Amino acid sequence: HHLLDIGTGSGCIAISLDKRLPDADVEAWDISEEALAIARTNNEELESRVLFRQRDVLSDDWEKSPSFDVIVSNPPYVTEAEKDEMEANVLDWEPALALFVPDDDPLRFYRRIVTLGRELLLPEGKLYFEINRAFGREIAYMLEMNQYRDIRVIKDIFGKDRIVTANR
């Protein structure tokens, strides 16, 4: 299996997948070279085999071909309006680039990844998102409008929408 983590940050999801699924090939993308340097250090220290690449998923300046069985993403999804509700420890340790989206376009990364999934996922490929609890219905609808199947919105331990899954 070939898995892709979009917006990998420190690489924790990609490295966890690699450790849990030793027969899988895991690739991870991020726009931030600084984040990728941390991810590569984590990869080395944890003796993982993830391939990290610097990619801006919002641009079209790279070749796309269907090759992934699974795409996972925990993209930026906190609106600027929600910033005041954030815990100080999150704001102190997470770069703003990894957290925030404009109030006028909070679904920009989801919209782009849904489109990319149509290009990058193999038939029957699976898409997994962590989401802002306020947008579960909108993201599920977006997936439906893009001909994804078996769409599920999964709640976290507090009963809030947190994960969306879908099949190509």
Language-model regions: role of each:
Residues 77, 167-168:
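C-terminal beta-strand of the catalytic ATP-binding
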Residues 77-108:
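Mobile active-site "lid"/loop adjacent to the S-adenosyl-L-methionine
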